[in-house]
């Protein structure tokens, strides 16, 4: 069951693909469920550039470090988690790109026995908001201006992927950890800050 309107849109999209696949003979599909994409291409030539204020944690962190956001807020610190903040499964965008290549190969080589296959793309490890902040501070050497704010309505306490099927069927596994995500995201932020300052 979808926990938020955003999650509901993803669920509806999956249902459309499943329905189309069911009623279209010889059509095969693969659905990839991203958990929390983060990071940027290691070259810092490709990365996330949200229109308007970012809502994803990692761009909020990097923009705060760059001085574009004066202070970031951790939405709640009394959840039943190891440090009181929400837990998410962050997955590097390069790992997601790799999964797309493997999924395409899976379909083109006829490896998918079902008409519609679904794979979770995440590391399988949950990271708290405070752990993400600490990782960024460690790899960047910058102290983030942050404080605890109120909980947000609809925030799920903890969510992380079971990626066993993607590992088994696609031969995929994540290669990048949280520190890698933070390093590449910070490098990207520094690149776009330099470009936009000109």
Which role does the model predict for each range below?
Residues 1-36, 45-56:
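Catalytic helix-loop patch of NAD(P)-dependent Rossmann-fold dehydrogenases
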Residues 1-2, 30, 41-43, 89, ...:
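A generic short-segment signal for beta-strand/edge and adjacent turn/coil regions
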Residues 36-39, 188:
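Active-site micro-motifs of SAM-dependent methyltransferase domains
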Residues 58-198:
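C-terminal substrate-binding subdomain of Rossmann-fold SDR/epimerase-dehydratase oxidoreductases
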Residues 41-54, 61-64, 70:
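Hydrophobic, Gly/Ser/Ala-rich alpha-helical and linker tracts in large acyl-processing enzymes
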Residues 39-41, 78-79:
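Short, basic/glycine-rich phosphate-binding loops at helix/coil junctions
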